Structures are given as structure tokens and as C-alpha cells.
Amino acid sequence: MDNAPAFTAVLFGLRGCLVQAANGTPSPAPGALATLASLRQRQVPCIWLDDLDAPQSKRLAHVLPAWLPGHSVNGVRWPAPNACWQALMALDSERLDGCVLVSGDPRLLQSGLNAGLWTVGLAACSPFCDRSSRQWQALTPQEQDLARGKATLELFSLGVHSVIDHLEALDNCLQDIAQRRRKGEKP
């Protein structure tokens, strides 16, 4: 098999991953719109997930493309796999093989692992490395690098399959996962 099958779906955490709220005003995270456009061009279904109630989630998601569906957790909370499976059902996904979850939220990443998905941790938006805090802004570049390194280690200790600093690196990460799938690796 020369090429790994196309990705079945990519699930994203909403808060911190796709949307940042600076001073209470939501805006797309750096690289979010380009990443979503690239996946859409390749016809990879995408959906966002969040554990906020639906009105709060929709308020944040209004800065994202209208074509992007979302799923707010109903019932069983993360890290149970239910939300990931429900999001995949909302996309009419027929299989788990080739599904990827991207987030900096450890509970959502654990949910993805429990659901049998490939998982990509976002170090810069994980709680271990909170970019929106005043403390983060006060750090020197070296201290920020150390914090990102610690966040990377914390995310890998959860069991995630890959860790990237930001969404701009997702395309290369997906290529790496495709290579791993080509070799027969499973999540």
C-alpha cells in the first residue's frame, strides 16, 4: 500500500485550539482558519467539540467558518469517549480508522484516546502553558520555551500520539501520522 487512506475526520477542541478569547472577545487562534480551509479543500470532514453549554459554545464559534459544525457535550463528561463518538456520528463517519483529535485540553485528549482516535496535543494552548495569562506575557522567551517543553512532556505523558506547538504545524503532523498509518500503526 503506497499511500495511507485519507483521514476520515479531524475533531478539534473549540476553546484554546480553534478560538482564543482575548479580553473576553473571541477570535480565531493563529493558523485555525488556514488549517480548516486546507482540510476542507482536501475534503476531510471537521468538527469542533466543547464542554460549554450550547449558547456559550456558539458565541465562541461564530468567528469560525459557517460550514464548520460543532458538538457540545451532552450528558457524560470528558474523559469519557462519548463526545468524540457523538461528534463522529454527527459527521456521518463510518469508521474510527483515520480519525484525529486535536486539542490542548488534557480531558478532551483523554476522551479521544479512550475513543480510539489518533490524538494531537497542542502544547501552547494546554493548561500547562497558558498563553492568555498575564504571567505568560511576563515570561522571557527562554522561560516560555521551558514552559512549552514542560507542556509537551505533560501531554506525551497522557499518551497522546503527537504534540505540536501551534496549529500551523498540524499539516506536517498529519503527514507524520499518515506515514505511521502507512506502516500499519494504530492509535
Each model region followed by its residue ranges:
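Asp-based, Mg2+/Mn2+-dependent phosphohydrolase catalytic module
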Residues: 1-44, 49, 54, 61-100, ...
